[in-house]
A protein has these predicted regions:
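Phosphate/diphosphate-binding loops
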Residues: 57-58, 79, 108, 240-242
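Thiamine diphosphate
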Residues: 1-41, 46, 51-74, 155-249
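Short coil/turn connectors at secondary-structure junctions
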Residues: 16-22, 41, 48-51, 76-81, ...
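Conformationally flexible catalytic loops at phosphate/diphosphate-handling active centers
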Residues: 81-173
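Short, ordered loop/turn segments at secondary-structure junctions
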Residues: 2-3, 25-29, 87-89, 212-214, ...
Length: 249
């Protein structure tokens, strides 16, 4: 956790440098007193870094997302870093079984020559940490270059949708979304929501569920369609900021 917060400056730098690096973020309590319980506040910090952000519910999700994350992040029209996030304790401090892929398959090969940002000699050693010198000035071209590059990074994140949807079987999962009461969540909050739904149904209350798998890109249209019949939407989160509820609103 402290590693993520100490590395915050690097995340937007990776995105701006178009480096398809993957990090696995284990979301546990970040404030004192220390806790290994889930706390997705640091995911809130990652939302505007230019990274892809996926949120695993289970150990199986985490395993699958890690492998599939490389495939998406390394696409030439994407080529930005990805954070595969999972929740503390329920995923990080428990044991579970996962289904492994067949032994005779491997990840798609990565071709560095299809990098959308050519590596120039002045940038190659040890790694292209900084863009061309002309942007390091206080003038219009410096501002315009920086601003337009941020838009390109956001566009790259959006372009990842078409690669992500077939790999993850959609950006969301839906269960009984025709009901008037819905729970919309991500990560292990979805697992706890399923138990809440089971208890509510025992009392005659029918509740549907929407599981969000990718936070960046955020499935705005998918969520809008899934919740179009809902009169009440509950968004359980393991953080004090309520960032997922704001995205859904």
């Amino acid at each position: 956790i402290s590693g993520t917060l100490r590395a915050m400056e690097n995340f937007p730098m990776w995105a701006g440098s178009r480096l398809p690096i993957q990090v696995c973020v284990t979301c546990r309590g970040i404030n004192s007193p220390l806790s290994i319980q889930p706390d997705t506040l640091e995911m809130h910090y990652l939302l505007e870094t230019g990274m892809l952000v996926w949120h695993a519910e289970t150990a199986q999700d985490l395993f699958d997302f890690i492998l599939k994350g490389f495939i998406v992040a390394e696409q030439p029209d994407v080529h930005v870093p990805i954070a595969v996030c999972c929740d503390g304790f329920f995923v990080t401090h428990t044991k579970d079984t996962v289904d492994l892929p067949p032994d005779d398959i491997c990840l798609t090969p990565y071709d560095p020559y299809r990098n959308p940002q050519p590596v120039m000699d002045m940038e190659s050693a040890p790694i292209r940490m900084m863009r061309d010198p002309f942007v390091m000035k206080s003038n219009y071209i410096s501002y315009a270059t920086h601003a337009s590059w941020q838009q390109e990074i956001k566009a790259a994140v959006e372009r990842s949708r078409k690669h992500t949807i077939p790999l993850l079987d959609g950006l969301i999962d839906e269960e009984n979304t025709d009901r008037e009461i819905l729970i919309v969540g991500s990560g292990t909050a979805v697992s706890q929501s399923r138990e809440a739904i089971r208890l509510l149904e025992a009392e005659g209350v029918k509740v549907g569920l929407v599981k969000i798998k990718t936070i960046r890109p955020f499935p705005y249209e998918e969520v809008r369609q899934a919740t179009k019949n809902a009169k009440h939407i509950f968004v359980p989160e393991f953080n004090v900021a309520g960032w997922l509820a704001r995205e859904i609103k």
